[in-house]
Amino acid sequence: TTKGPMSISITLIGVQKNKILTRSGAKTGHDIYVTGNIGSARAALILDKKTKGYKYFRKSLVMPLPRVALGLELSEFASSCIDISDGLAKDLKSIAISSKKGFQVNVDSIPTDPKFDIYVKASLKEQCILGGGEDYELCFTANKKYARKINNISSKYKIKITRIGVIKSTGYSYSLNSKQYNPKVSGYDHFKGN
């Protein structure tokens, strides 16, 4: 993420034979998971650079940790997967569209850093956890029968993996405090430059 006049991007593409994780395999009834904490990179972007909060979250923005080894293990059984680069709401919707499915997400279940509520105003929380990208955590779906395996992988890598919802046959819905919730953010749009 840059506000400067120049941006350089490098892309490497490769395929692990017979273990391809795509966006298009989610099935109705599969659980939705995320790795790590969501919203930290966006928090760094919106907080004043002179604050303790910015200093605390800065590493999440400038040095995200790719979940490569964890992703390789997930490729054994996950039905779909995407990295959270454009915001959880947008990236999860990409899985749903590619899979021709819907989803239900419990916003209360989306994990944030333990100090998130200390440094980020409540009014900015949605923008960070649903609309903010650059976390590069994984959002994936898996059959319920893999719940124990997912817990074991979480322990093995010492990376939190949290169930945040379920794939539905149609529609996109969110709940917050056990009530229907309509997010006001949609994620990063590369063509708008937001």
Where are the predicted features?
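Active-site glycine-rich loop that binds ribose-phosphate moieties when present
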Residues: 10-22, 55-73, 121
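Short clusters of hydrophobic/aromatic residues that line enzyme substrate/ligand-binding pockets
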Residues: 21, 45, 61, 188-191
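Internal active-site segments that recognize and position negatively charged phosphoryl groups
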Residues: 30-36, 64-88
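Short secondary-structure transition/capping segments
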Residues: 36-50, 151-161
